[in-house]
């Protein structure tokens, strides 16, 4: 991987529910299907996905030759359990990730030689890169730690961009609890306020505010009662760097409470 493979962008994608794979009425599905045409036309050497649906005590990376498709959901249409996204893995990239994290002071970086791709990874990737011909590695989140930890993970991984690796955080701009009632009339005010705060903070480059969102963001406890769907954003943000420019590249809603806000970060 040489300098000609340089990638300036990292991304955060709100992946929603697994239904995005089959529900043509979802604007987020059309957005991801148009990925190469409208958002990112370059074919990366490999893809690193940080998914909300892999939580571990220490940073962990999967080391496999071929990625299995994990059906980590229940009660959905049978068709969803028939999809296969058998993208190759990349043990070489996994080793590089370990080295970068260790070199940045992360004392324990684990490997998982059995794990494939959960729906936070394969559902969007199936829409973005349906050929499944690009090697994919997945990195876990540590939901018991904070945004700054995940931002530093991203900072450590930034050299991968110069090696042709596309870094994608996959979570959700808002991810309320299952018991949160949907809004029957537009977007719930609490969700709109958080979503607007996030867009303003990111596009203004106020990344430290986003790292410390628990003291800065309105209604954060409603938007993210658990943080695992937010932390992939921090990794993408950290990998882009503090002087990068953030841009909202998609926004739509489920039930007026779940935001599909998705962002591109471009390094200067």
Curated annotation (Swiss-Prot):
> Keywords, A to Z?
Cytoplasm, Dioxygenase, Metal-binding, Oxidoreductase, Zinc
Q: How does activity depend on pH?
A: Optimum pH is 8.5.
Task: State its location(s).
Answer: Cytoplasm
Which SUPFAM superfamilies does this chain map to? LigB-like
Top-rank taxon of the source lineage equals: Eukaryota
List the Gene3D superfamilies hit by this protein, alphabetically.
Answer: LigB-like (3.40.830.10)
Report residues binding Zn(2+).
Answer: 15, 53, 175, 229
Single annotated GO MF: stizolobate synthase activity
InterPro entries membership: Extradiol_dOase_DODA (IPR014436), Xdiol_dOase_suB (IPR004183)
Record EC number: 1.13.11.29
The enzyme class is oxidoreductase
| A Pfam short name | LigB
Q: How is the cofactor bound?
A: Binds 1 zinc ion per subunit.
Repeat listed as a keyword: no
A cellular-component GO term for this protein: cytoplasm
Q: What protein family does this chain belong to?
A: Belongs to the DODA-type extradiol aromatic ring-opening dioxygenase family.
Q: How does it assemble?
A: Monomer.
Function noted in UniProt: Opens the cyclic ring of dihydroxy-phenylalanine (DOPA) between carbons 4 and 5, thus producing an unstable seco-DOPA that rearranges nonenzymatically to betalamic acid. Produces mainly (S)-betalamic acid.
Instruction: Output this protein's name.
Output: 4,5-DOPA dioxygenase extradiol
**Which species is this record about?**
Beta vulgaris
High-level lineage: Eukaryota, Viridiplantae, Streptophyta, Embryophyta, Tracheophyta
Name of the coding gene: DODA
